[in-house]
C-alpha cells in the first residue's frame, strides 16, 4: 500500500514514499549510537561501562569477600613476627634507580614517537638504545671497562667465604714390606677386628697375615687361576674369594676349608663385596654382569645386566643405592637391590672405571678411571656429581677411604696419592719402589685397604710384595 502527499488543491506534491520493508527507527538510532561511542569514545572518554560487566565485577568481589573473610587478616602473633626487625636490604643498582626517578616523560624503550621527536630536534645528541640507561659511562671508560659495584663485590666476598679449606692430615710413611707371594698381589681384605688381613695373588694362593707383626699365619689353596677379589664378613667367620677361574668360594675360617661354591659366571670374576647387614654376596666379572647371591643357600637372587663390558669393581652398602658397580664401558651404575633394577647410570667418565670406594660415614662414594679428572666424587642416593680430584695422571687401579676423610689412590705406574676427601686437594704424593727379588718385579699398585682405625694402609703391587703405610702422629 502506498500513500502520496497532496496539496490543498488536490495535486500530487512528489513521488510516493514506500512505508513497508524499512527497519524500525529505534533500532537504527541504537546502532548508530553504538558506532559513535566506539569511534569517538577513546578521545572523549565518554564510553560507559557495560552493565553486565559491572555486575560481574560486583558479584566476584562479593564472593571473594565472603569466601576469604576469615583469612584476610593475620593473627596477632604472625603480625608481630612480620613487623619484627628487618634484615639487610638488597643493594639497588644506581642506573635503575636513576631511571625510575627521572619522571614519567622518560621512556626506557624507544618507539616511533621517540624517533620522530629525535628527528625533529637535530640539536639533540643520539643516545644508545638500551632497556636501562647507563649513566656512568665516563667513569666506566676511565676505569678501562672494569666497573665495580657493591653487588659484585658482595658476591665475590660470598664466593670466597664458601670455599672450604682442607683439613690438616699427618704424613704417611712406609713402615713394613711383606714378601711371600709368587705373583702380582691383586686383592686384599681386612679383618673387622684389625687383627689380621688376607691377600690374594697371581700364584693362586690366599695368605693370611698378622697385622701387628707381619708374619704369615695361614695359606689357603683351592683356586686354579689368579685371585682377583677378597672380602671378609662382619657378621660371620667367613672369607669370600673370587678368581679368573669363574669360581666364587666361601671359606670357613674356623675350619680353614671351603664350605660353599657359587656357580653362574661365564667368565672370570674380578670383584666381590659382602653386604654389611644382609646375608647377600655381590660379584662382578668379565661377562659384564653383576650377580647377587644368597650367602647361605648359594642361590643366584638377581643377575643385574646393563653393562656392556667387564665389571671392574662392585661395592655394597646398607642404604640406597645398595649396589654400585663400575665397568670398562666407562659407566657407573647404581642398583636397587630390592627391585633388582638399575636406578641411575653415571656417564661422566671417559675411560674404563676400575675402582670404587664408599665413604664409611658420609653418604657418598668415589670412582676412578684413567686420564685427566679421573677420580670423581658422587653423592648418594641419586649419584649427584660433586667434584673432581685433579692431579693423578695415571691409570687408577684402586681407591680407599678412611673415616678421617683421607682418600688413597694407587695407579698402574706405581704412583700413590693421598687426598683430602672433602675438598679434593692432594696433600701427599708417594712412589712405589719395586722390591728386588725377581726379574719381572715392577712398580704398580693393584689393591689397597685401610684398617678399621684408619691409621694404617695396606697395598698390594706388581713387585709381589705387600706394603704397610702408617700415619705419623
UniProtKB/Swiss-Prot annotation:
Please classify the protein's predominant subcellular localization into one broad category: cytoplasm
Matching CDD domains: WD40 (cd00200)
Q: Which PROSITE patterns match?
A: WD_REPEATS_1, WD_REPEATS_2, WD_REPEATS_REGION
- Name the chain's protein: Pre-mRNA-splicing factor PRP46
Designated gene of the protein = PRP46
**Family per UniProt?**
Belongs to the WD repeat PRL1/PRL2 family.
- Its domain of life reads Eukaryota
Q: Where is this region: Disordered?
A: 1-21, 103-126
Species assigned in the record: Cryptococcus neoformans var. neoformans serotype D (strain B-3501A) (Filobasidiella neoformans)
Q: Which GO terms describe its cellular component?
A: catalytic step 2 spliceosome; cytoplasm; precatalytic spliceosome; Prp19 complex
Positions of the WD repeats? 180-219, 222-261, 264-303, 306-347, 349-388, 391-429, 440-473
UniProt KW Calcium keyword: no
- Give me the segments passing through the membrane: none
Q: How does it assemble?
A: Associated with the spliceosome.
Q: Name one Pfam family in it.
A: WD40
State the UniProt keywords alphabetically. Cytoplasm, mRNA processing, mRNA splicing, Nucleus, Repeat, Spliceosome, WD repeat
Amino acid at each position: 500500500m502506498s500513500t502520496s502527499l497532496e496539496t490543498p488543491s488536490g495535486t500530487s506534491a512528489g513521488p510516493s514514499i514506500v512505508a513497508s520493508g524499512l527497519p524500525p527507527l529505534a533500532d537504527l538510532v541504537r546502532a548508530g549510537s553504538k558506532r559513535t561511542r566506539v569511534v569517538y569514545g577513546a578521545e572523549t572518554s565518554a564510553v560507559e561501562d557495560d552493565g553486565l560487566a559491572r555486575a560481574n565485577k560486583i558479584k566476584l568481589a562479593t564472593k571473594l569477600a565472603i569466601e576469604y573473610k576469615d583469612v584476610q587478616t593475620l593473627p596477632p602473633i604472625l603480625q608481630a613476627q612480620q613487623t619484627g626487625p628487618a634484615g639487610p636490604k638488597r643493594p639497588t643498582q644506581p642506573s635503575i634507580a636513576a631511571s625510575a626517578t627521572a619522571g614519567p616523560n622518560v621512556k626506557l624503550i624507544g618507539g616511533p614517537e621517540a624517533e620522530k621527536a629525535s628527528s625533529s630536534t637535530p640539536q639533540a645528541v643520539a643516545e644508545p638504545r638500551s632497556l636501562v640507561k647507563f649513566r656512568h659511562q665516563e667513569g666506566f671508560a676511565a676505569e678501562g671497562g672494569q666497573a665495580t659495584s657493591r653487588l659484585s663485590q658482595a658476591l665475590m666476598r660470598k664466593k670466597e667465604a664458601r670455599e672450604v679449606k682442607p683439613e690438616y692430615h699427618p704424613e704417611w710413611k712406609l713402615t713394613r714390606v711383606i714378601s711371600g707371594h709368587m705373583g702380582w698381589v691383586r686383592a686384599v681384605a681386612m679383618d673387622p677386628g684389625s687383627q689380621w688381613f688376607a691377600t690374594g695373588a697371581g700364584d693362586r694362593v690366599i695368605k693370611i697375615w698378622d697385622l701387628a707383626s707381619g708374619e704369615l699365619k695361614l695359606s689357603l689353596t683351592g683356586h686354579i687361576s689368579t685371585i682377583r677379589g677378597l672380602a671378609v664378613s662382619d657378621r660371620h667367620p667367613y672369607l669370600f674369594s673370587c678368581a679368573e677361574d669363574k669360581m666364587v668360594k666361601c671359606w670357613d675360617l674356623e675350619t680353614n676349608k671351603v664350605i660353599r661354591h657359587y656357580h653362574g659366571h661365564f667368565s672370570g670374576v674380578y670383584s666381590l663385596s659382602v653386604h654389611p647387614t644382609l646375608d647377600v654376596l655381590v660379584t662382578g666379572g668379565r661377562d659384564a654382569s653383576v650377580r647377587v647371591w644368597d650367602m647361605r643357600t648359594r642361590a643366584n637372587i638377581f643377575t643385574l645386566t646393563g653393562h656392556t663390558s667387564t665389571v671392574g669393581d662392585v661395592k655394597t652398602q646398607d642404604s640406597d643405592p645398595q649396589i654400585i658397580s663400575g665397568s670398562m664401558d666407562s659407566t657407573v651404575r647404581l642398583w636397587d637391590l630390592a627391585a633388582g633394577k638399575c636406578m641411575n647410570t653415571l656417564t661422566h667418565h671417559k675411560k674404563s672405571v676400575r675402582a670404587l670406594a664408599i665413604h664409611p660415614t658420609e653418604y657418598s662414594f668415589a670412582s676412578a678411571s684413567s686420564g685427566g679428572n679421573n677420580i670423581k666424587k658422587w653423592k648418594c642416593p641419586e649419584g649427584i656429581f660433586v667434584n673432581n680430584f685433579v692431579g693423578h695422571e695415571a691409570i687408577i687401579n684402586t681407591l680407599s677411604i678412611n673415616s678421617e676423610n683421607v682418600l688413597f689412590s694407587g695407579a698402574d705406574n706405581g704412583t700413590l696419592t693421598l687426598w683430602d676427601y672433602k675438598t679434593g686437594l692432594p696433600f701427599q704424593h708417594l712412589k712405589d719402589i719395586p722390591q728386588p727379588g725377581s726379574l719381572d718385579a715392577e712398580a704398580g699398585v693393584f689393591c689397597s685397604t685401610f684398617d678399621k682405625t684408619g691409621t694404617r694402609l695396606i697395598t698390594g703391587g706388581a713387585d709381589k710384595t705387600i706394603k704397610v703405610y702408617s700415619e705419623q702422629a
